[in-house]
Amino acid sequence: MTALRLLLAALLALPVAAPAASRIEAAPVPPEMRSTAFTVKVNGVPVDVAHAAASYEYVSFDGAGPFEIEITASEKGFWERGVDIEPWRLGLRPVREGQTIRFRLAGPAKLSISRPRDFLNYAKMLFLFAGAPLPPMPRKPEIHAYQPGVYRGSLNPKSGETYYLAPGSYFYGSLNLWKVHDVKILGRGTIVYEGNQDPTSDEGWRQLPDWHCVGALEARNIEIDGLTCIVRARTLSIQMKDSFGFTYDDLRVIGGNPGNANQDGMDWLGGGDSVVRNSFFRASDDVFALQGNWDGYSDEDMLRPGHDVENILIEHSVLSTSISNIVRTGWPRKTFNSRNFTLRDSDILHGGIGACGQSFAVFGLWGANGAKGSHTNYTFENLFLDNWYSLAQMEQEIPGLQGFTFRNIWALDQPPLVESTLTGDGSSVVFDNVKLGQRRATSNAELPLAVSGGAHPAEFVAPHGPQAAFTVEPPVFRAGEEVIFTATPSAHARYTWLFGDGTEAAGRRVRHRFPDAEGTELDGARTGAGRFRVLLHVEDESGHQDWAAEGLVAIGSWHEAEKVSAATEPGLDWQIYPGTWSELPDLNAERAVFAGDSSGLQANPQGFTHYAVAWNGYLDIPADGGYSFHLLDRDGARLVIDGVEVAKTGPPFAQVCNAPGNAMRYDLGSLGLHAGRHRIHVEGLHASSQGEPRLLWEGPGLPLTEVPAAAYSHLRRDAVTSSGRN
């Protein structure tokens, strides 16, 4: 018995091994598709990287997981600004060593890997598709089987046929489903579409064979599994006209074109009865679009009534666009009806930027300028918002909108950049547990939502089911110090924590130490404090769930408050720099022509319409802690605190379809600040858009909110003895 106890003790003392890495299957990429922008290893095995479109690359392999991922960028210093691995819901953070990042992936997933807030049409992005093991090819003599290799020409199946596209099979052409029924496309093949559409105008709407990656006309009962669509032309990626009964599973669509337009992910022109599941889309326009028809831009074409679109389900998918909406219904002057649309259990990685007449959103319904039709019973449920622009833009006047539900919408870190709108004859619009971080929106102001044009007030549903919320103790901490997380109790619930540093825990009350001050996106070194995206998932025994998120700052170095002995007064002083710059210039090389002061980020340009502004003064920090600052502006803005550049918005991004001005741009940064006054310097460009920069802050005991005027002060003019600029 003693020997048995000693053996048991020895076994218990052994370290617990991590799950063994799984075997993977990865087909070779043909030389003409191979990319050198990144090299990738999975479980130590090199996997070919393929070039998709624009500056997008992708890698694809199959296995059960787990997977040890190693990615090396060829561009020197590529990861120095940080790393953004999405979906954020997965809580992934890599280890960075020079040009290489490494992380562990538990199982099959579809990822976007880029640098923080770099996801527009010229971004360098790597998409990673870790697929579940592929079922064997069906053994039927009538199957058209294509082995690995390069094929030049389109696929034109006939009714009743099944095509099997083996992993490693590449087709330069289209999949044409023209008046066919009961067709199956199986396997893991790739279609590369390089059409001859005019790259400077919209010809992609046409319903023609060989005009899209997948084109369908009056097709019925189609199943497409495991297909990758690469779209390099300015055309709709997948178009279905008056077609019904389509099922897509494990679809991967990547589109990019220099015009950054008219490259939707999937369009219905009439028809429906469709299911899209477990799929990935990167579009250069709307990801999904519902129209009754589209026959051209003449008055006759625009006013011709279209066919109904109905019964569409999209679920368990990962969605991204470089510019437009995730889902769009309608268009000005168009007439058609739609009903029974559901998007659920999906991740919105990149939810548009700017406007085309109407601001872009997760959901846009644009029934303006005499558009007619009834649109009913739309549900958006269990959606995770990463980088997004607005939630909903809805306008329909004749006869109207009814039955739109937004339930369990979780914005995990970033605030909305513009408000949502509801205009015209709209009713029964319901917001049920729309959350921004930990805060649940309970009113128009909290969403925010603007209601006009006779629309009925939106309904905000009272809390029900499990509630995800948590506290942090202590609220201020340095890297390596213990932090206690406590979730609000929910009946019969399980609690799962993702700390944003690549680790997880379970339980209502857990302890954790953040390993460094780099933050989830590995961008904290430049400011001395890292923001970790902490997520809490609460699920009860019936499967009802809720999520909460909060950005917590681990402090690496403190910034001391400044002792100000001279007399001060409220507000900031400012200087005006006239000029016709297209981007924010280096104001150290420019000369201000006049100055003044204001209560906050306002200025009087005295008639100038093209100018830059610099605001200077002090920011009063209420308590010691880690603070995050969110900067929003259309033409370009920059924030400096205590001489450290905290945030700088990206270059101006023009709105389209004659919408005036530039899109709202966004950046954020974090600092460890002691209570008291800290020097603040803000720059803003006024070139083609209206409005001044917006500055929001959050910190210990301080929810995300606009920096109030009371927090600003500046030296009284008679106390100024010297001048300078950060």
PLM features per residue range, with description:
Residues R115, V538, V682-G684:
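Conserved structural position at the C-terminal beta-strand
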Residues G63-E68, R478-I484, D624-G626:
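Short coil/turn motif common to extracellular beta-sandwich-like domains
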Residues K110-S112, I484, R531-L535, G626-S628, ...:
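Short, conserved beta-strand segments of beta-strand-rich sandwich/propeller modules, principally
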